[in-house]
Amino acid sequence: MANTLEQLKSYTTIVADTGDIEAIKRYQPEDATTNPSLILKAAQIPEYSALIDNAIAWAKLQSADIEQQIDDASDKLAVNIGVEILKLVPGRISTEVDARLSFDKEKSIAKAHKLVRLYQEAGVDKSRILIKLASTWEGICAAKELEQEGINCNLTLLFSFAQARACAEAGVYLISPFVGRILDWYKKDTGKDYDAVNDPGVVSVTEIYNYYKQHGYNTVVMGASFRNIGEIIELAGCDRLTIGPSLLEELANSQVTIQPKLIPASTTVAAGEPLTEAQFRWDFNQDPMAVDKLAEGIRNFAIDQGKLEVMLKAKLAN
């Protein structure tokens, strides 16, 4: 009998949530996603030292200003890792815009253009890239403009229905609703444990998936941030699921028989008027979990980006 991972692949596109090339070789996902925390982790793998050296050397050629060099080296390293991953996956790589730009539409767009240009200079077409942006109002507006230019986006740190609805209305290519971080918040808030069926993160992604299919939106739903394989099994049938190496290994070692849980609606109905900025901000603000987790997620990605830059600054000084 096929293991649980192989069964899951027949219902859902599997994406590796890692910058670890060895893990990607092992589990053969369709796509891969990275973020500042994963790039920081990957940068500490000895096999990646040549990619870092290349980024440092390139950055020194671009500018004499140390702050600009750090910025350039950081972007180049993320792209170098992405290029290596794309040698192993048939699909796409998601590369994230600096979380510190989460509330600046214009700078987010400029950073996206720079990342796409670096990939193109490395021989990678934009059709194989997803630009990751936080699901703030500004991030969603940036994505709307990028999509109109033919640059596909992955809207991340998505914790609420309001964020999901705004992304669909903006014509975003893909969203990454977080499952495990929603569970974390509710467990801490209520002191309760949840089984996979009643897991608040699973319930959230299911609601978003059903809404998208019911209204005929083409935006891809890619569940993310899992705490256990029960959550993953309950979301079998979701368009895509991005899963870290430890849970990919657990799925590969499991023999649990699974069935699709998410099934697209057979008929569609027209959606209502798009959310205004004021409606979006009000609806989002009504969800304390989403407000907490989005703010925390942006802060934590910014912290890890800062740690990466400290490491790069030391190398640039040599």
Swiss-Prot record:
Location (main, coarse): cytoplasm
The organism of origin for this protein: Shewanella sp. (strain MR-4)
EC number: 2.2.1.2
Active site, renumbered: 132 (schiff-base intermediate with substrate)
GO terms assigned for molecular function: transaldolase activity
Superkingdom in the source lineage: Bacteria
Keywords: Cytoplasm, Pentose shunt, Schiff base, Transferase
Location within or outside the cell: Cytoplasm
Catalytic activity: D-sedoheptulose 7-phosphate + D-glyceraldehyde 3-phosphate = D-erythrose 4-phosphate + beta-D-fructose 6-phosphate
Similarity comment text for this entry: Belongs to the transaldolase family. Type 1 subfamily.
InterPro entries the UniProt entry points to: Aldolase_TIM, TAL/FSA, Transaldolase_1, Transaldolase_AS
Known role: Transaldolase is important for the balance of metabolites in the pentose-phosphate pathway.
Name under which the protein is recorded: Transaldolase
PROSITE patterns: TRANSALDOLASE_1, TRANSALDOLASE_2
GO cellular component, one term: cytosol
